[in-house]
Regions:
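N-terminal targeting/trafficking signals and adjacent low-complexity tails
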Residues: 1-190
Length: 190
């Protein structure tokens, strides 16, 4: 489930920007990167898509990081969606891609990574998983600093002050880190 088309637009825009920058700066190389926000908790934002005027929703209980969600049960959804797709070459391509992405992978992160790679891998897209343990190891010094110094919070407050003539759209918190374990995702508060 990629949710609204925003998922695809973000990736396509990133690939196009990398191409434009390469044309403008031919001696430099630009790599399109898709940051998969697998630690996010907002399943309601991504558990559906619209097709032929109909909303297809994955009705599943969700808690914790969405990337860790099991894809178990999507075979029932696939049957309904397959029927709506009908027959034909394009329908078969979409069915195959859905099966390979969501029915052959055990969690949403792996399924989404596979789908994005199938669609955009030939354009040099690099996919980063925010919940990857090896990636998080590199982030440890920044996490420690954030916990003890509240660096991001201070910078955001400074920026808000500099842009005081504009309406604040998001109110910052002192710590924007979470403790995660299995299906648990809790904000860290001191």
């Amino acid at each position: 489930f990629s949710g609204p088309l925003y998922f695809l637009y973000k990736i396509i825009s990133t690939i196009n920007l990398a191409k434009e920058l390469k044309e403008k700066y031919p001696t430099e190389n630009f790599v399109p990167i898709y940051w998969m926000a697998t630690e996010d908790h907002d399943f309601d934002e991504i558990n559906y898509f619209n097709f032929k005027g109909r909303k297809f929703r994955w009705n599943k209980e969700s808690s914790g990081p969405v990337g860790r969600l099991s894809t178990e049960g999507l075979d029932d959804f696939f049957e309904v969606f397959s029927h709506e797709l009908g027959i034909g070459k394009n329908a078969e391509i979409i069915k195959k891609m859905f099966q390979e992405s969501y029915l052959n992978h055990s969690n949403l992160a792996d399924a989404t990574r596979f789908l994005a790679n199938e669609l955009f891998g030939e354009y040099g897209l690099v996919i980063l998983d925010a919940d990857d343990k090896d990636l998080k190891r590199f982030f440890i010094p920044y996490i420690k600093e954030e916990l003890t110094q509240h660096t991001s919070h201070k910078k955001v407050l400074e920026t808000i002050q500099e842009l005081k003539d504009y309406t604040v759209q998001v109110n910052p918190r002192e710590i924007n880190l979470f403790y995660m374990e299995n299906d648990l995702r809790e904000r860290i508060i001191f």
